[in-house]
Amino acid sequence: MLRSYLSLLDQPYFLIPGNHDDRENLRAAFADFPHIGGSGEFINYTVEHYPIRLIGLDTLLPGSESGILCDQRLDWLDTTLTNSLKHRTLLFMHHPPFISGLPKMDKMGLKGSEKFAEVLQKHSQVEMILCGHLHRPVQTLWENIPTLVATSISKQFLLNLGGEEMETRIPEPTGLYLHLLTEEGLVTHTSLLPSAQ
């Protein structure tokens, strides 16, 4: 079903697995996509043919809502970044590496973020980290790197900065970030979309 919707886009698109995804199902549905249909345990990849390099990083931890960046994935990232030290780079990953203040979602956060930070401290070419998972738009400066979480394409959660109960779904609009690449850096615009309800 996802592929039929994405095929309506006029732009190229690249996918990373989220916490509800199954790698094998994703590979089967997008077998002709080199960055997904390839071999290997994880769906990590680079896209090199744009003015800024894109790196998709797989944070999936099967059977868990949480994500993980294990040593194997971090070694791959470190090697990949080392091989192109001067190429401006965007990282894409599902689970954000920071504490958001949303207690229920933070319990389902990213394991391995300390080692992830150690890798990134060696690589100043990473200009931004783009994430999902929180079902809310959130931005922070993490390890001196702008880190943005996009809205969900399905449901948004009520902003609850202290409650332990399950997140409440609310009819806020979804949206998207549009990143404008300039010589000075990245400029991010937020576009809210009409609700489909």
Which residues make up each language-model segment?
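Short glycine-enriched, charge-decorated loop/helix-capping segments at active-site entrances
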Residues: G63, L102-G109, G163-M166
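Hydrophobic/aromatic residues located in beta-strands of well-ordered beta-sheets
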Residues: Y13-L15, T89, I129, T147
